[in-house]
């Protein structure tokens, strides 16, 4: 989990709009963010394996 202070800091409006960055909506992680799903790769993997994301399946061949 990300530090609460950093999550709150990211939510505040920035002085310059280019400073704004995305964070995972579940854990608050700023890196490896997947814009289409709004979460980081770790949370995406956990949710996909549990079947919580519609249309996403684990590939096998």
UniProtKB/Swiss-Prot annotation:
Cofactor note as given? Binds 1 zinc ion per subunit.
- Kindly give the InterPro entries that the UniProt entry links to this protein: Ribosomal_uS14, Ribosomal_uS14_bact, Ribosomal_uS14_CS, Ribosomal_uS14_sf
Keywords for this entry? Metal-binding, Ribonucleoprotein, Ribosomal protein, RNA-binding, rRNA-binding, Zinc
For activity, the cofactor(s) needed are: Zn(2+)
- Write down a Pfam family by its short name: Ribosomal_S14
**Which SUPFAM superfamilies does UniProt cross-reference here?**
Glucocorticoid receptor-like (DNA-binding domain)
From its record, what is one biological process in GO terms? translation
UniProt-annotated binding residues for Zn(2+):
24, 27, 40, 43
Keyword Aminoacyl-tRNA synthetase part of the UniProt annotation: no
Keyword Coiled coil on entry: no
Question: TM segments?
Answer: none
- Which molecular-function annotations from GO does this UniProt entry contain? rRNA binding; structural constituent of ribosome; zinc ion binding
Q: Which HAMAP family match?
A: Ribosomal_uS14_2_B
Protein family membership:
Belongs to the universal ribosomal protein uS14 family. Zinc-binding uS14 subfamily.
Please give the subunit comment from the record: Part of the 30S ribosomal subunit. Contacts proteins S3 and S10.
The protein's role, per its UniProt record: Binds 16S rRNA, required for the assembly of 30S particles and may also be responsible for determining the conformation of the 16S rRNA at the A site.
Protein's UniProt name: Small ribosomal subunit protein uS14
What is the gene called? rpsZ
């Amino acid at each position: 989990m990300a530090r609460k202070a950093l999550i709150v800091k990211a939510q505040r409006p920035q002085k310059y709009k280019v400073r704004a960055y995305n964070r995972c909506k579940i854990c608050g992680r700023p890196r490896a963010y997947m814009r289409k799903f709004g979460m980081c790769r770790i949370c995406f993997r956990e949710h996909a394996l549990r079947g919580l994301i519609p249309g996403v399946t684990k590939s096998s061949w």
